């Protein structure tokens, strides 16, 4: 319970900083680039094999999304930034290329999908191996790390 309160406090603090900060779009998460995103598999000490980006940062799915359509925008996307790509995403070590795809967000940017799930980062994950968003109930639904098959890791 205490860790959930700390996470909730971090989320509120992040929103306050974002609201009071400069016009920069920095969220503390990996910055979206025009390059093609790479999704790979890494071993997490607590969760086992999970999906990550090319830098080893954990990616998540949102259970509220339907099909490949993202439902996370505005304040949600500040806490859970989408994994963006400048073209077809690439499969890194352990990832299955046929499970990778994209969906077009309302702003026209391409978001990476895996096994039909739009992918997101969590703003509190700062380094490879962090998976602090696992199982959080936020913005009307649960957030899960993905297994190499693309299933939610419960």
Region spans (language model):
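C-terminal motif of bacterial Sec signal peptides marking the signal peptidase cleavage site
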Residues: 15-19
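Bacterial signal peptide processing site
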Residues: 21-23
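Hydrophobic core segments of beta-strands in well-ordered, beta-rich domains
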Residues: 59-62, 120-122
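A low-complexity, Ser/Thr/Gly/Pro-enriched, surface-exposed linker/loop concept
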Residues: 69-101, 141-153
């Amino acid at each position: 319970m205490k860790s959930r309160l700390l996470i909730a406090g971090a989320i509120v603090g992040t929103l306050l900083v974002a609201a009071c900060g400069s016009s920069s779009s920095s969220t503390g998460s990996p910055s979206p680039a025009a390059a093609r995103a790479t999704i790979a598999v890494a071993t997490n000490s607590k969760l086992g094999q999970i999906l990550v980006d090319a830098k080893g940062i954990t990616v998540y799915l949102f259970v509220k999304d339907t099909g490949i359509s993202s439902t996370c925008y505005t304040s949600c996307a500040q806490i859970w930034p989408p994994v963006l790509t400048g073209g077809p995403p690439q499969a890194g070590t352990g990832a299955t290329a046929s499970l990778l795809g994209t969906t077009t967000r309302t702003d026209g940017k391409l978001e990476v999908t895996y096994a039909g799930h739009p992918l997101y980062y969590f703003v509190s994950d700062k380094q490879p191996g962090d998976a602090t968003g696992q199982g959080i109930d936020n913005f009307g639904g649960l957030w899960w790390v993905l297994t190499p098959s693309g299933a939610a890791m419960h």
